[in-house]
Curated annotation (Swiss-Prot):
Keyword Transmembrane: no
Gene Ontology cellular-component annotations: host cell membrane; host multivesicular body; T=pseudo3 icosahedral viral capsid
CDD domains: rhv_like (cd00205)
Short motif (L)YPX(n)L motif, span: 146-150, 179-184
Domain of life assignment: Viruses
MF-aspect GO terms: channel activity; structural molecule activity
Source species: Human hepatitis A virus genotype IIIA (isolate GA76) (HHAV)
Any GO BP annotation: symbiont entry into host cell
Pfam families, per the entry: HAV_VP (PF12944), Rhv (PF00073)
Name of the protein described by the UniProt record: Genome polyprotein
Site annotation Important for VP1 folding and capsid assembly: residues: R748
Classification lineage: Viruses, Riboviria, Orthornavirae, Pisuviricota, Pisoniviricetes
The keyword Acetylation belongs to this UniProt entry's keyword annotation: no
Region (Disordered): 34-55
Keywords: Capsid protein, Host endosome, Host-virus interaction, Ion channel, Ion transport, T=pseudo3 icosahedral capsid protein, Transport, Viral attachment to host cell, Viral ion channel, Virion, Virus entry into host cell
Length: 808
C-alpha cells in the first residue's frame, strides 16, 4: 500500500493487484483485498452420489457413433462401414463436444467397440481395422497388420480396439484438421450365410471414446532449412550404390555436423527396425469352401509351401491383395524358414466335420493329385474338428529341403532343373464329411492366413508379385476380456539372432506377462492374446547358424542401399531443375516414388530423420553446377520443369549449397537434413495432408557454362536411409496393382536420360586424340550441317533443271 497522505494528494487509490484463475489474468491498479467468507465444505449426506463431472466422465466415455446392417448380399471385402472416428465423436449429440469445441488442439488415443448380434443359424465374419490416416493403396488382405479385431459369428460378437495417437503433427486441429487421425474400416472377411427362415442381415453398432485426452488452446466458440551433408565424388568415375557403408553421404547440407534425436511421442512408441514386423503377422492368403458334397479323402485345396502364395483379389477398388509375407519376400532372391498356415473356419453351431492338413516335402512341381487320405497320414499332418469354441488350426511347416535356401523364381519365366521356390505342397483333405441340418448352409468357408517363423531372406531385388492361380476366402473374431498389444515390432529376427539360436522362438508364449499359453496347434485367431502364441505343430531342431554376418532383413541394411528416385536431362545453359522428395502414394512415377522406394515408404505410417541422396552425372561435359536443399513451406522454383531460377544466389547459399564441376566429378553424395516443421512425414494421407505432410523437402540443381561442345548432361538420383532414420507404426503393404516401376533403361536412353552410375571411361590417348581433332576441325558439327543443306539444294536444282540430250 502507498502512503495514505500520498493517496489523498493524488486523489486515487494507489494499490495494484494481479488476480485471475487458470487462463484468465486481470491487472487492477485501484484495487482492494478480496472479500472471502467461509470455505468449501464436503457433504456428510450427499445430495448426489454420482462422481462429480470431469474430463474423464464427460470426455472419455463410450458414445454410439454408427449403426449399420451386414447383409447376405455383401460380397467378400465389401466395406460395411468407413468411419472417421474423431469427426463422428465431434458431434453436438455427445457430451465430449462440450470440451472439444472450446479447445483448438488435442492429443488422444481412441478406443472402439464393434458389436454384432448373430443367431446360431448365421455364419460368416467381419474384420474391423483401425487405419492411421487413410487406407490408400494398402492390400485389403493385409488389414490384419493394423490394430484390428475379427468377428466370427460362431466365436464372438464384439471386438474392442485401443490405439494411441499416431500423427505427423504434435496435435490434432479440431476446427481445421489436416487429415483424419484414425479411420475405422469394417469389411466382410467371410460372407454372411443364413439358415432357412433366418433374417438376411445382422445389425452392427460401433461405440467409440477418447482415451488419454489432452486438450490445448482454449478458444472462443465460433461457427464452423537449412542444409545437409554432401561428399563430392567418391572417385571420379565410380560410385557404389549397393550398400549402406558406401552409399551414405560423408558431407551434409546441414548447418552443423548434427545428429537427430529419437522421438517416439507421436508414433505410439512403435518403432520398426526389421521386416519381421510384417512377416510374423498372419495375413489373408486364400479362402476355400468345405462342402457337404465333399467325400471322405477328397482333396479340397492344394497350396504350395512358399512365402509368395496369395490368391485374394478385389474389384472395387481393383486390387491384387498381396499378403504382408509375400510383399516382403518378393523383394529378396532367396528365402528359408518355417511357414505358418492358419486355417480359420466359419461354421454355425450346427455344422460338424473334420479336415486333415498334410505337408508333402518336395517342390512346387511335384504331382500330389494321386495321394490318398491314407497315404497322407504318413507325411506330417494334423486333423482339425471344425465344431466347438476353437476356430483356428495353426499348421507350422518345418523347413525340409534339399538346399539351405530356395530361390524366388517368379522374376523369370524359364527355369532350370533344380531351381525351386517351394519346399513342397500342403494338401487339405476331407477327413470326416460335413454334416448339418437342412435349414443351414451346406458349406463352411475356411480362411487361410500365412506368416513365417525363423524367416531369413537375403539378396535384395525388386519384383511385384502376381496372384497365384487359385481362389480363396476368410473371416475372423476377437476375445476382449484382457487387452493385448497387437503387432509388436520385431518379435523375432530370423535365425540371425542369439535369441533364435537358443531356440526360444520355438516355445509357445503369450503376450501377457506371467501367463504361459498351452503349447499346441489349435487356437482362436479371433482372440489377440491367443493369436500371438508362437505356433508349434511338430517337433523341430534348432535351425542352426546363418551363413551371413549381415542381416539382410534389417530395414537399415536393406534401405541403406541406394534405390533409384528420378532422372532428368538439361537442354540449355543457365537453367535449374527442382524435384520434390514426396512420399505420397497418390503420385505416380516419374513425379512420385518409383518401385522399391514407393513400396518401402508405404509399409509404415510415419517417417522422420535425414535421407542420403546420391546424384550421378552422365555425359562428357565441363559444366559448373550447384545443388541446394529447400525445406517444405519455403520459396522454391517450379518443380519438375527446366527453367531459369527466380531465386537469388543469396537465398540459395543461405539455405546451404554445394558447388561442383562435372569434368572433375561424376557423382555427388548428399545428406538431406531432417528440417521440417512437422513431427514426421507420411506417404499414406488423405485430403490436404497429402499435399503438406507427405513431402520431405525439395532438391534443386542449377548449371552454368553449358555449351554445344558438351554432350548431353543428365542427372540420375538415388535415395537411401541413414542410421538416424526412424520408421513408426506398420501399415498394410501396397497391393500389387499400386506398385509403380520406373521407365525401362531403353526408354531413358531414347529420351537421353541414361541411368548410369559411371562417367564415360576415356583414356589419356582418347583425350589427346579428341583434342587434336577439335583443333583441326573446330566447326565440324556446323560444317556437317551446312553440307546437308548444300546437298539438299543441289538435289532440288537437279529436279527442276531440264537436262540436255545425251551426246551420241
Amino acid at each position: 500500500l502507498a502512503d495514505v497522505e500520498e493517496e489523498q494528494m493524488i486523489q486515487s487509490v494507489d494499490r495494484t493487484a494481479v488476480t485471475g484463475a487458470s487462463y484468465f489474468t486481470s491487472v487492477d491498479q485501484s484495487s482492494v483485498h478480496t472479500a472471502e467468507v467461509g470455505s468449501h465444505q464436503p457433504e456428510p449426506l450427499k445430495t448426489s452420489v454420482d462422481k462429480p463431472g470431469s474430463k474423464r466422465t464427460q470426455g472419455e466415455k463410450f458414445f454410439l457413433i454408427h449403426s449399420a446392417d451386414w447383409l447376405t448380399t455383401h460380397a467378400l471385402f465389401h466395406e460395411v462401414a468407413k468411419l472417421d472416428v474423431v469427426k463422428l465423436l465431434y458431434n453436438e449429440q455427445f457430451a465430449v463436444q462440450g470440451l472439444l469445441r472450446y479447445h483448438t488442439y488435442a492429443r488422444f488415443g481412441i478406443e472402439i467397440q464393434v458389436q454384432i448380434n448373430p443367431t446360431p443359424f448365421q455364419q460368416g465374419g467381419l474384420i474391423c481395422a483401425m487405419v492411421p490416416g487413410d487406407q490408400s493403396y494398402g492390400s485389403i488382405a493385409s488389414l490384419t497388420v493394423y490394430p484390428h479385431g475379427l468377428l466370427n459369428c460362431n466365436i464372438n460378437n464384439v471386438v474392442r480396439i485401443k490405439v494411441p495417437f499416431i500423427y505427423t503433427r504434435g496435435a490434432y486441429h479440431f476446427k481445421d484438421p489436416q487429415y483424419p487421425v484414425w479411420e475405422l474400416t469394417i469389411r466382410v472377411w467371410s460372407e454372411l450365410n443364413i439358415g432357412t427362415g433366418t433374417s438376411a442381415y445382422t445389425s452392427l453398432n460401433v461405440l467409440a471414446r477418447f482415451t488419454d485426452l489432452e486438450l490445448h488452446g482454449l478458444t472462443p466458440l465460433s461457427t464452423q532449412m537449412m542444409r545437409n551433408e554432401f561428399r563430392v565424388s567418391t572417385t571420379e568415375n565410380v560410385v557404389n550404390l549397393s550398400n549402406y557403408e558406401d552409399a551414405r553421404a560423408k558431407m551434409s547440407f546441414a548447418l552443423d555436423q548434427e545428429d537427430w534425436k529419437s522421438d517416439a511421442s507421436q508414433g505410439g512408441g512403435i518403432k520398426i527396425t526389421h521386416f519381421t514386423t510384417w512377416t510374423s503377422i498372419p495375413t489373408l492368403a486364400a479362402q476355400f469352401p468345405f462342402n457337404a458334397s465333399d467325400s471322405v479323402g477328397q482333396q479340397i485345396k492344394v497350396i504350395p509351401v512358399d512365402p509368395y502364395f496369395f490368391q485374394m483379389t478385389n474389384t472395387n477398388p481393383e486390387q491384387k491383395c498381396i499378403t504382408a509375407l509375400a510383399s516382403i519376400c518378393q523383394m529378396f532372391c532367396f528365402w528359408r524358414g518355417d511357414l505358418v498356415f492358419d486355417f480359420q473356419v466359419f461354421p454355425t453351431k450346427y455344422h460338424s466335420g473334420r479336415l486333415l492338413f498334410c505337408f508333402v516335402p518336395g517342390n512346387e512341381l511335384i504331382d500330389v493329385s494321386h495321394i490318398t487320405l491314407k497315404q497322407a497320414t504318413t507325411a506330417p499332418c494334423a486333423v482339425m474338428d471344425i465344431t466347438g469354441v476353437q476356430s483356428t488350426l495353426r499348421f507350422r511347416v518345418p523347413w525340409i529341403s534339399d538346399t539351405p535356401y530356395r530361390v524366388n523364381r517368379y522374376t523369370k519365366s524359364s527355369h532350370q532343373k533344380g531351381e525351386y521356390t517351394a519346399i513342397g505342397k500342403l494338401i487339405v483333405y476331407c477327413y470326416n464329411r460335413l454334416t448339418s441340418p437342412s435349414n443351414v448352409a451346406s458349406h463352411v468357408r475356411v480362411n487361410v492366413y500365412l506368416s513365417a517363423i525363423n524367416l531369413e531372406c537375403f539378396a535384395p531385388l525388386y519384383h511385384a508379385m502376381d496372384v497365384t492361380t487359385q481362389v480363396g476366402d476368410d473371416s475372423g473374431g476377437f476375445s476382449t476380456t484382457v487387452s493385448t498389444k497387437q503387432n509388436v515390432p520385431d518379435p523375432q529376427v530370423g535365425i540371425t539372432t542369439v535369441k533364435d539360436l537358443k531356440g526360444r522362438a520355438n516355445q509357445g508364449k503369450m503376450d501377457i506377462s506371467g501367463v504361459q499359453a498351452p503349447v499346441g496347434a489349435i487356437t482362436t485367431i479371433e482372440d489377440p492374446v491367443l493369436a500371438k502364441k508362437v505356433p508349434e505343430t511338430f517337433p523341430e531342431l534348432k535351425p542352426g547358424e546363418s551363413r551371413h554376418t549381415s542381416d539382410h532383413m534389417s530395414i537399415y541394411k536393406f534401405m541403406g542401399r541406394s534405390h533409384f528416385l528420378c532422372t532428368f536431362t538439361f537442354n540449355s545453359n543457365n537453367k535449374e531443375y527442382t524435384f520434390p522428395i514426396t512420399l505420397s502414394s497418390t503420385s505416380n512415377p516419374p513425379h512420385g516414388l518409383p518401385a522399391t522406394l514407393r513400396w518401402f515408404f508405404n509399409l509404415f505410417q510415419l517417417y522422420r530423420g535425414p535421407l542420403d541422396l546420391t546424384i550421378i552425372i552422365t555425359g562428357a561435359t565441363d559444366v559448373d553446377g550447384m545443388a541446394w536443399f529447400t525445406p517444405v513451406g519455403l520459396a522454391v522454383d517450379t518443380p519438375w520443369v527446366e527453367k531459369e531460377s527466380a531465386l537469388s544466389i543469396d537465398y540459395k547459399t543461405a539455405l546451404g549449397a554445394v558447388r561442383f564441376n562435372t569434368r572433375r566429378t561424376g557423382n555427388d553424395q548428399i545428406r538431406l537434413p531432417w528440417y521440417s516443421y512437422l513431427y514426421a512425414v507420411s506417404g499414406a494421407l488423405d485430403g490436404l495432408g497429402d499435399k503438406t505432410d507427405s513431402t520431405f523437402g525439395l532438391v534443386s540443381i542449377q548449371i552454368a557454362n553449358y555449351n554445344h561442345s558438351d554432350e548431353y548432361l543428365s542427372f540420375s538420383c538415388y535415395l537411401s536411409v541413414t542410421e538416424q532414420s526412424e520408421f513408426y507404426f506398420p501399415r498394410a503393404p501396397l497391393n500389387t496393382n499400386a506398385m509403380m516401376s520406373s521407365e525401362t533403361v531403353m526408354d531413358r536412353i531414347a529420351l537421353g536420360d541414361l541411368e548410369s552410375s559411371v562417367d564415360d571411361p576415356r583414356t589419356e590417348e582418347d583425350r589427346k586424340f579428341e583434342s587434336h581433332i577439335e583443333k583441326r576441325k573446330p566447326y565440324k558439327e556446323l560444317r556437317l550441317e551446312v553440307g546437308k543443306q548444300r546437298l539438299k539444294y543441289a538435289q532440288e536444282e537437279l529436279s527442276n533443271e531440264v537436262l540436255p540430250p545425251p551426246r551420241k
